[in-house]
């Protein structure tokens, strides 16, 4: 069905097509949806039905949680959500590079605020594994950034299976500085202390996950993993989008500002994943994302060290069948 819809959707502005696709999910007939049986994965104290989940960014506010659940994901990550709602960057801010199965976005954490997301999650019927990705508001300076993350963490704790700390988006000014040295250590210190309090308050432990940039040096990644191991962070998502354009040079829209995702990100993000595996071994769960649009690319991520996978841009180009193709292919190995 998606192969019939895609040419029509691709005639629309990318952000309009995104919104329309999410709306259409609510009206698809029941026979289109199916459960996908896979090999369970035990990670971060959770049992994932199979390896393939949805990356953050598709449903920022949790408005489409039940519809997305019917596509067969092992887990769904909502967000990025911030303490207060914000409009994000001016439009247009989402661009396809169809020649390369790629997307450039400079959305800028557009979302309705954490309170709206929580209410949407509470209304949903979804009972599966839910990640919630949290960030800071654009106007919050770096010295106060930890307060934004703590505020969101407290709000979502009782509704999340795990919480992702997004400090690697290229579309919020200076955000990636939070991956550096003292900023990073202080942020994790405060979040870990809050995690202990919240676990006692709610009677359950919710793992923290860090989403990293593919554009950091090997030295920075090593410093980050040392701090991650020190503070007992249980997961790393590798990776966010890249600012590099080497892989799409001279293609239409390639000069647009923002983060590049999709197939051209595959090599860079997988290299980062492989490096992280060397640094953390089996002590931290690695979630591979970036360029997964086939069984082969999924296998490459797993071989590089990923226990779990996330897709987003691959869905735009391949449709929901991508989930089934990957899971059934991994089952056959």
Curated annotation (Swiss-Prot):
Keyword check for Flavoprotein: yes
Principal subcellular localisation of the protein: membrane
Name of one Pfam family that matches: DHO_dh
Enzyme class, broadest EC rank: oxidoreductase
Entry's cofactor comment: Binds 1 FMN per subunit.
Location(s), subcellular: Cell membrane
PROSITE patterns per the UniProt record, alphabetical: DHODEHASE_1, DHODEHASE_2
HAMAP family: DHO_dh_type2 (MF_00225)
KW Membrane (keyword) present: yes
Quaternary structure and partners: Monomer.
Taxonomic superkingdom: Bacteria
Binding sites annotated in the UniProt record for FMN: 56-60, 80, 133, 166, 211, 239, 262, 291, 312-313
Binding of substrate, residues: 60, 105-109, 166, 171, 240-241
PANTHER family the record matches: DIHYDROOROTATE DEHYDROGENASE (QUINONE), MITOCHONDRIAL, DIHYDROOROTATE DEHYDROGENASE (QUINONE), MITOCHONDRIAL-RELATED
Catalysis performed (reactions): (S)-dihydroorotate + a quinone = orotate + a quinol
Pathway involvement of the protein, from the record: Pyrimidine metabolism; UMP biosynthesis via de novo pathway; orotate from (S)-dihydroorotate (quinone route): step 1/1
Functional summary from the UniProt entry: Catalyzes the conversion of dihydroorotate to orotate with quinone as electron acceptor.
Catalytic residues (positions): 169 (nucleophile)
Family assignment from sequence similarity: Belongs to the dihydroorotate dehydrogenase family. Type 2 subfamily.
Gene3D superfamilies: Aldolase class I
Protein name from the UniProt record: Dihydroorotate dehydrogenase (quinone)
Gene source species: Legionella pneumophila subsp. pneumophila (strain Philadelphia 1 / ATCC 33152 / DSM 7513)
Any Gene Ontology CC annotation: plasma membrane
InterPro entries tied to this protein: Aldolase_TIM, DHO_dehydrogenase, Dihydroorotate_DH_1_2, Dihydroorotate_DH_2, Dihydroorotate_DH_cat, Dihydroorotate_DH_CS
Gene: pyrD
SUPFAM superfamilies linked to this entry: FMN-linked oxidoreductases (SSF51395)
């Amino acid at each position: 069905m998606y192969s019939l819809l895609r040419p029509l959707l691709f005639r629309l502005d990318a952000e309009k097509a995104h919104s329309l696709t999410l709306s259409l999910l609510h009206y698809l007939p029941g026979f289109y949806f199916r459960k996908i049986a896979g090999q369970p994965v035990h990670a971060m104290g959770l049992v994932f039905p199979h390896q393939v989940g949805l990356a953050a960014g598709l449903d920022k506010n949790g408005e489409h949680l039940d519809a997305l659940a019917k596509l067969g994901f092992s887990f769904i990550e909502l967000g990025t959500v911030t303490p207060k709602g914000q409009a994000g960057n001016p439009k247009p801010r989402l661009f396809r590079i169809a020649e390369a199965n790629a997307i450039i976005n400079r959305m800028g954490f557009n979302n309705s605020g954490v309170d709206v997301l929580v209410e949407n999650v509470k209304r949903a019927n979804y009972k599966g594994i839910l990640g919630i990705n949290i960030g800071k508001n654009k106007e919050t300076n770096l010295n106060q950034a930890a307060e934004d993350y703590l505020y969101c963490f407290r709000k979502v704790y009782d509704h999340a299976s795990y919480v992702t700390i997004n400090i690697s988006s290229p579309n919020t000014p200076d955000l990636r500085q939070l991956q550096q040295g003292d900023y990073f250590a202080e942020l994790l210190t405060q979040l870990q202390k809050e995690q202990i309090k919240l676990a006692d308050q709610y009677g359950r432990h919710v793992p923290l996950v860090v989403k990293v940039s593919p554009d950091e040096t090997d030295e920075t990644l090593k410093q980050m993993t040392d701090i991650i191991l020190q503070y007992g962070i249980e997961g790393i998502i590798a990776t966010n989008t890249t600012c590099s354009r080497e892989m799409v040079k001279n293609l239409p829209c390639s000069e647009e500002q923002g983060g590049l995702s999709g197939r051209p990100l595959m090599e860079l993000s997988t290299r980062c994943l492989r490096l992280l595996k060397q640094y953390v071994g089996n002590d931290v769960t690695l979630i591979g994302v970036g360029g997964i649009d086939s069984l082969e690319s999924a296998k490459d991520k797993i071989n590089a060290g990923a226990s779990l996978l996330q897709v987003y841009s691959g869905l735009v180009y391949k449709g929901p069948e991508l989930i089934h193709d990957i899971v059934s292919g991994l089952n056959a190995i």
